[in-house]
């Protein structure tokens, strides 16, 4: 932009002996077609005025003419901007435009005083060219330097005034692109907002130190391609941000390797948590853990001891009260489980022990499996204090060990066979219907080939994701105690009664209470007999016709109403097969 070029502190003239290093300038493309500003080509001697000391007077004259032309153009631009502000009051302008044009007005007044005082070009080469980004007021010396070096790119052009008149519709910068130096496209806000009658630019482009440094580097660089790419990046509207991002010295601390390592650690932690959760779930589902189910474990061991005591009368059976001394009242669940567990088993006589024999039983504990059961039950403190230390240690290890190690320890320590968990019978006992027959018989075959009776309440615990759907097995039908004499005799209707009932049925299939009472008095029958006859007659007609309501057809198609008493029609069979997915 022309305004940016005039107000930018980075475009000061170079000191003598060096090439000019101001960034490539873009003129403001004025949007009104009748007001266009064209650069008047100046002689090439204005560029190398500092390199030819012999032609100092000519260079000073040309430089003064150039300054006057710039002043005239700056005044025109200021008037144009004031007209635009008056015409488009509702358009939002960048907050930096007013400050920039105030600085331009101050600059014009100062320049006129300087030119009236002395026209020497050396006075305009004051070297302040790095204004801080926070400064919004441009000093007089810097303003002179800015104006002195603002149109260096236009002095190097070789186009004539006729060429500029032909290229009226082209930006002023395009006429200067024939020079040897690499020119840049106009900024993004000039390319995309040609139709908007406003002057909007960023204050960071004017007051940025980084952009001036980047422009110097691109001017002094040897590689043309690198300088063009860096200057193109700096020519966008976010030039300071692009330059600072490109000049980042330290890379990011969070690299791709760190990201992969972090994701790998997360996956490992998730896998460990999943494994621990699955192990805990397996321990709870595959066996009756004594810590989780103390009552169930106690009942299992009690039923096992009863069976072993029935086979071996000399076996020592600890009384039940010994296992549940702290809980004086027996829970209803435990009593019910014991009662159910004794169904279908041989009744064993439990030896009654006197209180004097209890210390001897505690002093000589039963096998290790019983000791571990006692220590893991509700009377842990009383049992562990009297039983051997080996029994307590085996109990403590059995609480924390896996089911397989617990079973192996019981095999090594005790002579009787351990009770296998329900998972040994069926892993998916809640899903399959094959366990219905097992629960009816109540016997399973262990690894040793020995037939063992399981208590019936074991199969009441369901490991299923389905809701409750009734009993787990079919109950055997109870033998009917009623004899044929107690049954109600079948009513034998006479021909006159049947004829009258049929005639009434043909008139109306449903009887009212008054009509039923009249028929009862006329035919000498009970009201219940007449009502039942009408119900049976309606059912026979319904079966013979085979017509079903739509709800029954829908339920049959879903398999929820599959009564086989009525044969299905072809349409119903086809509908049912289609609903079941047998036919497409």
UniProtKB/Swiss-Prot annotation:
GO cellular component: nucleus
Keyword Nucleus found: yes
UniProt keyword annotations, A-Z: Developmental protein, DNA-binding, Homeobox, Nucleus, Segmentation polarity protein
Biased composition (Pro residues): 12-23
Function of the molecule: This protein specifies the body segmentation pattern. It is required for the development of the central nervous system. Transcriptional regulator that repress activated promoters.
GO biological process terms on file: axon guidance; genital disc anterior/posterior pattern formation; gonad development; imaginal disc-derived wing vein specification; negative regulation of gene expression; negative regulation of neuron apoptotic process; positive regulation of transcription by RNA polymerase II; segment polarity determination
Matches recorded under CDD domains: homeodomain
Region (Disordered): 1-27, 141-198, 343-380, 392-451, 465-492
Biased composition (Basic and acidic residues): 478-489
SMART domains linked: HOX (SM00389)
Protein name as catalogued: Segmentation polarity homeobox protein engrailed
InterPro entries xref list: Engrailed_Homeobox_TFs, HD, HD_engrailed, HD_metazoa, Homeobox-engrailed_C-terminal, Homeobox-engrailed_CS, Homeobox_CS, Homeodomain-like_sf
Organism: Drosophila virilis
Protein's gene: en
Ranges annotated as biased composition (Polar residues): 189-198
Compositional bias (Low complexity): 348-380, 392-405
């Amino acid at each position: 932009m022309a305004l940016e070029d005039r107000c930018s502190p980075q475009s000061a003239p170079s000191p003598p002996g060096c090439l000019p290093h101001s960034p490539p300038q873009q003129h403001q493309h004025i949007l009104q077609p009748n007001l266009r500003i064209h650069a008047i080509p100046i002689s090439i001697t204005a560029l190398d005025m500092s390199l030819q000391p012999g032609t100092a007077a000519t260079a000073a004259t040309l430089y003064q003419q150039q300054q006057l032309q710039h002043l005239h153009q700056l005044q025109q631009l200021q008037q144009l901007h004031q007209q635009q502000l008056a015409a488009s009051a509702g358009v939002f302008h960048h907050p930096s435009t007013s400050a920039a044009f105030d600085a331009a007005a101050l600059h014009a007044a100062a320049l006129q005083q300087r030119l009236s005082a002395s026209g020497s070009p050396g006075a305009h080469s004051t070297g302040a060219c790095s204004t801080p980004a926070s400064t919004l007021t441009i000093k007089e010396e810097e303003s002179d330097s800015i104006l002195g070096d603002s149109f260096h790119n236009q002095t190097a052009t070789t186009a004539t005034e006729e060429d500029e008149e032909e290229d009226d519709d082209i930006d002023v910068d395009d006429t200067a692109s024939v020079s040897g130096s690499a020119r840049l496209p106009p900024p993004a806000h000039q390319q995309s907002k040609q139709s908007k009658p406003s002057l909007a630019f960023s204050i960071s482009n004017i007051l940025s130190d980084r952009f001036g440094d980047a422009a110097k580097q691109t001017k002094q660089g040897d590689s043309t391609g690198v300088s063009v790419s860096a200057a193109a990046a700096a020519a966008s509207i976010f030039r300071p941000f692009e330059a600072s991002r490109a000049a980042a010295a330290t890379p990011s601390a969070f690299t791709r390797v760190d990201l992969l390592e972090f994701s790998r650690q997360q996956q490992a932690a998730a896998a460990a948590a999943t494994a621990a959760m699955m192990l805990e779930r397996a321990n709870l589902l595959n066996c009756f853990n004594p810590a989780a189910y103390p009552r169930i474990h106690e009942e299992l061991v009690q039923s096992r001891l009863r069976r072993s005591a029935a086979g071996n009368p000399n076996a020592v059976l600890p009384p039940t009260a010994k296992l549940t001394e702290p809980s004086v009242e027996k829970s209803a669940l435990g009593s019910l489980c014991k009662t159910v567990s004794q169904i279908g088993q041989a009744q064993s006589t439990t030896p009654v022990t006197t209180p004097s024999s209890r210390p001897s039983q505690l002093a000589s504990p039963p096998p290790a499996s019983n000791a571990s059961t006692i220590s893991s039950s509700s009377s842990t403190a009383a049992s562990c204090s009297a039983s051997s230390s080996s029994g307590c240690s085996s109990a403590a290890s059995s609480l924390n060990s896996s089911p397989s190690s617990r079973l192996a320890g019981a095999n090594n320590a005790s002579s009787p066979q351990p009770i296998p968990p329900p998972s040994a019978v069926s892993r998916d006992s809640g899903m399959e219907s094959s366990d219905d027959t097992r629960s009816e018989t109540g016997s399973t075959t262990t690894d040793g080939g020995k037939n063992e009776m399981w208590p019936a309440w074991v199969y009441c615990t369901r490991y299923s994701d389905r809701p409750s759907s009734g009993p787990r097995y079919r109950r055997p039908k109870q033998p009917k105690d009623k004899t044929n004499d107690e049954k109600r005799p079948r009513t034998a209707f006479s021909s006159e009664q049947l004829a009258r009932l049929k005639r009434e049925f043909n008139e109306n299939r449903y009887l009212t209470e008054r009509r039923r009472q009249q028929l009862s008095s006329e035919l000498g029958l009970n009201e219940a007999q007449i009502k039942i006859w009408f119900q049976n007659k309606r059912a026979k007609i319904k079966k013979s016709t085979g017509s079903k309501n739509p709800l029954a057809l829908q339920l049959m198609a879903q398999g929820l109403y599959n009564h086989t008493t009525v044969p299905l029609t072809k349409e119903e069979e086809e509908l049912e097969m289609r609903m079941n997915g047998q036919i497409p």
